[in-house]
Amino acid sequence: MSDLFAKLMDQIEMPLDMRRSSAFSSADIIEVKVHSVSRLWEFHFAFAAVLPIATYRELHDRLIRTFEAADIKVTFDIQAAQVDYSDDLLQAYYQEAFEHAPCNSASFKSSFSKLKVTYEDDKLIIAAPRFVNNDHFRNNHLPNLVKQFEAFGFGTLTIDMVSDQEMTEHLTKDFVSSRQALVKKAVQDNLEAQKSLEAMMPPVEEATPAPKFDYKERAAKRQAGFEKATITPMIEIETEENRIVFEGMVFDVERKTTRTGRHIINFKMTDYTSSFALQKWAKDDEELRKFDMIAKGAWLRVQGNIETNPFTKSLTMNVQQVKEIVHHDRKDLMPEGQKRVELHAHTNMSTMDALPTVESLIDTAAKWGHKAVAITDHANVQSFPHGYHRARKAGIKAIFGLEANIVEDKVPISYDPVDMDLHEATYVVFDVETTGLSAMNNDLIQIAASKMFKGNIVEQFDEFIDPGHPLSAFTTELTGITDKHLQGAKPLVTVLKAFQDFCKDSILVAHNASFDVGFMNANYERHNLPKITQPVIDTLEFARNLYPEYKRHGLGPLTKRFQVSLDHHHMANYDAEATGRLLFIFLRDAREKHGIKNLLQLNTDLVAEDSYKKARIKHATIYVQNQVGLKNMFKLVSLSNIKYFEGVPRIPRTVLDAHREGLLLGTACSDGEVFDAVLTKGIDAAVDLAKYYDFIEIMPPAIYQPLVVRELIKDQAGIEQVIRDLIEVGKRAKKPVLATGNVHYLEPEEEIYREIIVRSLGQGAMINRTIGRGEGAQPAPLPKAHFRTTNEMLDEFAFLGKDLAYQVVVQNTQDFADRIEEVEVVKGDLYTPYIDKAEETVAELTYQKAFEIYGNPLPDIIDLRIEKELTSILGNGFAVIYLASQMLVNRSNERGYLVGSRGSVGSSFVATMIGITEVNPMPPHYVCPSCQHSEFITDGSVGSGYDLPNKPCPKCGTPYQKDGQDIPFETFLGFDGDKVPDIDLNFSGDDQPSAHLDVRDIFGDEYAFRAGTVGTVAEKTAYGFVKGYERDYGKFYRDAEVDRLAAGAAGVKRTTGQHPGGIVVIPNYMDVYDFTPVQYPADDVTASWQTTHFNFHDIDENVLKLDILGHDDPTMIRKLQDLSGIDPITIPADDPGVMALFSGTEILGVTPEQIGTPTGMLGIPEFGTNFVRGMVNETHPTTFAELLQLSGLSHGTDVWLGNAQDLIKEGIATLKTVIGCRDDIMVYLMHAGLEPKMAFTIMERVRKGLWLKISEEERNGYIDAMRENNVPDWYIESCGKIKYMFPKAHAAAYVLMALRVAYFKVHHPIMYYCAYFSIRAKAFELKTMSGGLDAVKARMEDITIKRKNNEATNVENDLFTTLEIVNEMLERGFKFGKLDLYKSDAIEFQIKGDTLIPPFIALEGLGENVAKQIVKARQEGEFLSKMELRKRGGASSTLVEKMDEMGILGNMPEDNQLSLFDDFF
């Protein structure tokens, strides 16, 4: 018994007879872990054998009681040298396990504790009845039971459960007997109770009124019971149980109303042991309001019965009682002015690595009273804009930084080179084997070397070294060296001196020499021996530069490639000899290929300019000190992503040096070079490196814990020593030492979310590399990386002493924060590019077009509108935005394409006049194209100018033109006209790339960038990660817990991208780094466009963003124009035939039954979906204005369903009068008599879904104003239901395009179908489409049946849409031809009379490139055989076979070799 253990036994007053027993003879305390914050002590004991059960219980009880008196919690485990597997001892400990958490859960204990155990075939066997859920046991309880037996001293047991038939029968018989007895007893008790009740009852005649039952008293008692009830951890519930009480946080709520008017609240709660689904019913609205506390984020106590939900098949609590409880968040307990500053924190913008939003990080720091907090995401600054805004709001300083990947520009092949002929040199090629990767914490166990001259080994050195302790299994497995190899080995210092003598006058050579040389120098330094000064060649870097085409340059792959023997890789003597053989191959190739003859040439002539791509990455934290530093930071991020990206963004050291002004550098985490030097090279080397930085980072010991598992550091004491060494490095280098937390999530319980995210990366990620080998190998655990308070951080560093801990945790971090100046990350103004005379040009173009249409002088209504808009546009610097858009549209028009507008730009009459949009926002009006006479209808009686009746000009008799959609300008630039315009344009998909290049041409390559986006983990993706984690790590979560974990893991950055049409334009008097860094989308360095590093929304109020989107409508219009020669601009918007499509099918010459729909909407943009077709069937629109209403209703949220649809059905309103588009609200209210400002404000509140979110006082003010002006109540109620509304200008642009397409469907049908299939159809099945009506209808019926059963694939759903159009075309008398090898186009459908000939790409599996190749090949000559079609046409065997089956190839032979018989004919 050790002295320390004996002292402990004295303190707990362990009985002497037990202390003197053989079990305690060699007892010792291996380690005691003290957690000062939680007041938890963990004892780790060593005993000669597993303790008798009575002794164990005595030790356990006395330890607990003794330390409880000091308010200290105790846990302990035992390592036993010998294990007794006798049945009695195992049975006793098995039952003891159920007295310890988490095995002591009620359900587990009651179901399993009485089972019998035995030890057979090296397994602990549990005999159980067959109705026990074996899978549930394995997933939920087996891991806990294994851990508990390990803590008892049995080591890692294999535990299995088997079904016992005898026990099953016995328990079944007992259950039946018990149930019968209970029923019998219940009946008897009931009879006796009835008799007693009758005996107690007074005579009837003397009966008095029964006392009233006191429901209030009963409710009070029930409530009191609820308040005092025992809280059950959710993890313990495994079966249906009654009157269970949970406490936890609500993370999901859904409220539903049944058809009977009852309400159900489905919600999910977690107590962080697990999660649970719950239900609460409310009979009416009044009762529902009592449960408003059931809200996301609320902490509740609930009581109810656990039952299996019949729909979800999972356990659900039916809640009976619920109350809100106070949850005590962690607090920073240090006084004001004595709180730390966190300087190393990651947000969810650290790709697949961290969880908190920058807002939550800053809010937490502010809540704790910290004066500042730093943001240091991995290699990016995408959280800066949000962090900037949030910090200003929270009143806290944000320190903007990042954790960078620093690399050396050129990694040398040779260290300390001298002028020496490589051919005449003597080389000592050496290798070392060690017990780990840390020169400071691990030991040398072998040094071996081959002295070589001109390719021959002239002398060898091979010595083992005894480290003074047994080798770990990992070391033996890796190196092949066992303890037997080390028996009788020489002392380390003797071997070191001998090796130094062996190396004299030679060039040292090693593979990955930085490791071997570093290890040797650290050991030389430790024994006061001179360090290596002679030249060194690193064959790893030699190979990388000499053979850059090879993917792998490790010793194993290189020896295989060059056929060099390597029989025992990782034993130093074999590795050294193999490396020597490779060296002389490299020297020969370097001489022959590159003329390398001298040692000095290796670094100057052979090291590649891009050797940084293979250089080892070192982490460093970089912080913005001032505004100059911010711009330099943006430049560094850009260069690392654009010029130096290789796997990850890299910053070469010289690039960092060139941009270091205004920046401060920290040494970062264990992946930083200073920390690495302390581990692998020694303090002296670390001091030299530390001088480059502005401060030294140290982190809580828990952050470094994975290094212990990876055997880089021995134990907790080793971690603490490394931290002391880092402090010593700072002292010697005269650099402050700062304690940082390496934050990756905020709360300790969020650790599991990061675990799930990180493990989803798979074993290819460095962080997931396994420890050891084999099936059971697991990655190192992730560190405890939550956001720590000041007091928690001081506890972590308590081992340094109070004063030093305070200095590194508080004082130094505050001092650093004080060095940081306030910077402007996001600018406060809009900076538009400069185009010479933009203002004059916009005004000139506007008036020029207005005079052309409306005459000069202009009508007052036109003149005033132009003046109003130009005042806003020119006065706020928006002219350049208008002019740039006009230039882009004009260029596309010149290439023969129409450009459609999106959004609210059609609300601007200036935009209409200069050609940005076709939508005219003026009130409905007539205008004469000859004399410019005009008439305006301003009373709101007409919804659209296109609906005005045709009539001639009263002045000259020319037919009037009709226009005007009555849209206020305010809906585009705001009521005051100062909102930054967002001009979205729909270019043809074919012309979109050219339009993008136009932006570069207009503004310059260095000023035009694609708008960047950030892609995060979606909740569905996170769900998959959780299920994968369950599978890979043997977990089992109930459904609610999976949902919680998925929600927690969602939102983390996964990738970057680009807006499909957004282009950001930087003003040409500034540069992009004034606003944002730049990068390639999704790290694709081959991309033709660079993107903004920031999400474009973060800077959209600072720079011009042009939305140049690709759309099918302009492409289809161009196709129809090419086919027909009709200018789409001349197509009338009020064509009667087109309008007839919305009321029936007669205009198409078919019946509804033939085409399966009552109207002609199939294939018409905006109106062809099932949803909108249903709306058309219900509303029967007859005017353009009503079509606008339909467009608005179909695109809005809660505008049609449950709102306008009901109003129309009930006859309260009509399609014309319901609220359809956002702009209609303002126009309608102004016509009703409301002031424009109030009408505008009401519109804004409604369209954004804010009507019910604004204060009751504000809302009532609007309601009163509307009622005073006779706005009906149904209209007001409709406003309250709306969540989102579509802009009328957007609807007008879309409807106008749709009507043009519909015009061709009515009047030029074969051209319409040709264009539709060429451009809009997504899926084809040529065999069906060419098979006639019966084949088409049969296939549609087949897909319909699949849809009903939810079995249809996405391709089949797309195919159904195509077949609807094919069916309609065939029913109208047109034909669908077969693919023709010599007539079909590569990608376009062809018209041959009344028949459509499909293109090659319509054949499933045949892509555009092959289609074009076939067309090109047939132009060169006829295909004589299938083999020739494959060879010249590039078609695969499968495609050729498919063509043959469809009869496309006719009698084409397999090959064009003449048979013997052909000569006779």
Curated annotation (Swiss-Prot):
It is found in: Cytoplasm. It catalyses: DNA(n) + a 2'-deoxyribonucleoside 5'-triphosphate = DNA(n+1) + diphosphate. The keyword Cell cycle does not apply. CDD domains: DEDDh, PHP_PolIIIA_POLC, polC_OBF. The keyword Transferase applies. Keywords: Cytoplasm, DNA replication, DNA-directed DNA polymerase, Exonuclease, Hydrolase, Nuclease, Nucleotidyltransferase, Transferase. InterPro entries: DNA_pol3_alpha_NTPase_dom, DNA_pol3_finger, DNA_PolC-like_N_II, DNA_PolC-type_N_I, DnaE2/DnaE/PolC, DNAPol_HHH, DnaQ, Exonuclease_RNaseT/DNA_pol3. This is DNA polymerase III PolC-type. Belongs to the DNA polymerase type-C family. PolC subfamily. Required for replicative DNA synthesis. This DNA polymerase also exhibits 3' to 5' exonuclease activity. One of its GO terms (cellular component) is cytoplasm. Coiled coil: none annotated. It comes from the Bacteria. One of its GO terms (biological process) is DNA-templated DNA replication. Pfam families: DNA_pol3_a_NI (PF14480), DNA_pol3_a_NII (PF11490), DNA_pol3_alpha (PF07733), DNA_pol3_finger (PF17657), HHH_6 (PF14579), PHP (PF02811), RNase_T (PF00929). Residues 427-583 form the Exonuclease domain. Its EC number is 2.7.7.7.
